[in-house]
Amino acid sequence: MKKILKLFKLSSFFILILIILSRAYALETKHVDIWSDGTRMSGDIFFPLGFNIDVPNPAIIMAHGWGGKRSDLNRYFVPKFVKAGFIVLTFDYRGWEDSDSRLVIIGDQPEIDQNGEINVYAKAIREVVDPIDQTRDIFSALDFLCGEEGVDTERIGLWGTSYSGGHVIYVAAQDDRVAAIYSQVSYQGNGRNIRKNFYRQRAIEKARGVIDPIPQGIDIIPKLLGSPDLAKMLGYRPIDWAYKITVPTLIVDVEQEELFDRKKNGLSVYNIIKNNAVSKYHTFPGTHYDIYYQYFEASTNLAVQWFVKYLK
């Protein structure tokens, strides 16, 4: 009986230690609503241990890739950046996860009443991949973060992966509030032009009302979540903005990238940026999705080290 009691006490002691440690490393967070062109986006802000609003803190905005969701960022990526001393903001693009939908009026627009209001039937737009709207959402997230107490607006970084790896280049090139960039396995708009005529045909069909103004359920790419708005993708080329980047930028690729030509995208962007800013290009072996599994730890550590070096 004494041995049992002793084991029970030891077990209780170790459980208590684990609880204390888990609380010590628990992330302080709050849910936030971010407004982007009149539509609410759902987001989360995470704060480092010992956060003090009276002391300006460096911050990072994380943008997930094609069909991604912030909950995955929150679970796997965010803790590493927060433990390194950063405030982190994540969000879901409009029309994804628990962010509100963009709305399109069904039928003819009713007459406007004396208060300037109308009652309409509308279609909720969900899970459409629109690079123009998504980059607008990142700008809105940046606006929101700059109004958050305790954020040093001179030390804000952008982290983007896959399709959003191009978005962060596009945004940073146009917004001088961005102080550092990390972009991994990124498509920079420098792809093959064999489908350009089809993209243009989709734009014609939208303008003439042949297809929905924001098409859903068409042109879906196998194994990828969401409907691409091909008309919006036609002229979207972050690489064309790379020459305006003047802040430290780390580009990470995989050597056997199978979704696009990395040399025409990530490497080409690096070769442009290096002329005007501190920059680095790094590759891992493997294919696109290996960055999230086999090379998750190594790539994320590179990102943390980059932001520590240039934001802290």
Go through each PLM region and give its residues:
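Conserved alpha/beta-hydrolase
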Residues: 82-102, 110, 114-117
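The serine-hydrolase catalytic nucleophile loop
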Residues: 67-79, 93, 264
